[in-house]
């Protein structure tokens, strides 16, 4: 689909002018130089995406297992009474491995066979083009996934069959971000992959979108509230504390990245709000009944 990026029918002089005036052109030329055969391969997008996954998991697994008692990380831990152990991490990695064998690698093979090489444009995208498209992709995914997520919680048979797999963990950590039922992985992966198809999207914009979408999805699962976290700057951004709350109280904080829909619909709640509740309300707020969760597997 990236071949839909418009071909610029420019004269030599016009092309040189555009190359000299586009802010991202030096970076685009540097990225392409000598790497064309890799970047144009239909295998590049899936393995690029996997490399982002593996990096987040590797970094925060090291932090969770070996640095959890370092004061900086200990203070930033949201659910301080929950320790991330190697046994917990292995359970998530095992499911991720099966999901990759079921979906990721077969889809990579399909792309290798049927998808032509990506045509790498000569020109970089303009800054406005890239930023405006990334903003639209971000808003579109956040809005759409909110409703997918909301329905998965409100339709009980769907929750029990599909989304409860992700909620085996009430205290998330980076490796649990991809602890998903295959159906949910397919939906989320397909939407992240195809949403840029609504525009003629430059492949550089496409790759940056992949990085942002996956990184934000991991960031909200890390289980740490760092002093530099984005939610401390932008009130409309959920961040790790909101999604941590969602895992602890699964009928709250449905929106994945922003929080405006949760605020409008009364689902946004903080740990400070919990402390203000009466004991009776605290015991039930945002939780399923014991009957609703009967028979579901809980890992932590």
Curated annotation (Swiss-Prot):
Motif Histidine box-2 location, chain numbering? 163-167
Membrane topology qualifier: Multi-pass membrane protein
Name the needed cofactors.
Fe cation
Q: What is this protein called?
A: Cholesterol 25-hydroxylase-like protein
Gene Ontology CC entries for this record: endoplasmic reticulum membrane
**Where does the record place the Fatty acid hydroxylase domain?**
135-266
Offer one example of a GO biological process linked to this entry. Answer: sterol biosynthetic process
What is the annotated role of this protein in its UniProt record? Probable sterol desaturase.
């Amino acid at each position: 689909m990236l071949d839909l990026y418009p071909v610029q029918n420019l004269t030599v002089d016009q092309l040189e002018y555009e190359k000299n005036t586009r802010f991202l052109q030096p970076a685009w030329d540097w990225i392409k130089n000598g790497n064309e055969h890799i970047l144009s391969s239909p295998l590049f997008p899936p393995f690029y995406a996997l490399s982002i996954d593996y990096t987040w998991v590797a970094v925060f697994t090291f932090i969770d297992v070996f640095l959890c008692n370092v004061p900086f990380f200990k203070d930033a831990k949201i659910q301080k009474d929950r320790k991330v152990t190697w046994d917990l991490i292995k359970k998530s990695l095992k499911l991720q491995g099966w999901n990759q064998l079921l979906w990721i690698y077969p889809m990579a093979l399909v792309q290798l066979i049927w998808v032509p090489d990506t045509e790498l444009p000569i020109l970089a995208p303009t800054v406005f083009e890239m930023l405006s498209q990334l903003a639209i992709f971000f808003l579109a995914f956040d809005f759409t996934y909110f409703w997918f997520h909301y329905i998965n919680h409100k339709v009980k048979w769907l929750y029990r069959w599909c989304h409860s797999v992700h909620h085996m963990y009430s205290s998330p950590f980076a490796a649990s971000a991809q602890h998903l039922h295959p159906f949910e992985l397919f939906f989320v992966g397909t939407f992240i992959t195809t949403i840029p198809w609504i525009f003629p999207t430059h492949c550089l914009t496409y790759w940056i979108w992949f990085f942002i979408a996956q990184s934000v999805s991991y960031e909200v699962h890390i289980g740490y509230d760092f002093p530099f976290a984005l939610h401390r700057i932008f009130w409309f951004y959920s961040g790790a504390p909101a999604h941590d709350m969602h895992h602890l109280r699964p009928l709250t904080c449905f929106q994945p990245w922003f929080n405006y829909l949760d605020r409008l619909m009364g689902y946004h709640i903080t740990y400070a709000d919990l402390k203000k509740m009466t004991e009776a309300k605290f015991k039930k707020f945002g939780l399923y009944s014991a009957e609703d969760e009967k028979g579901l597997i809980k890992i932590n």
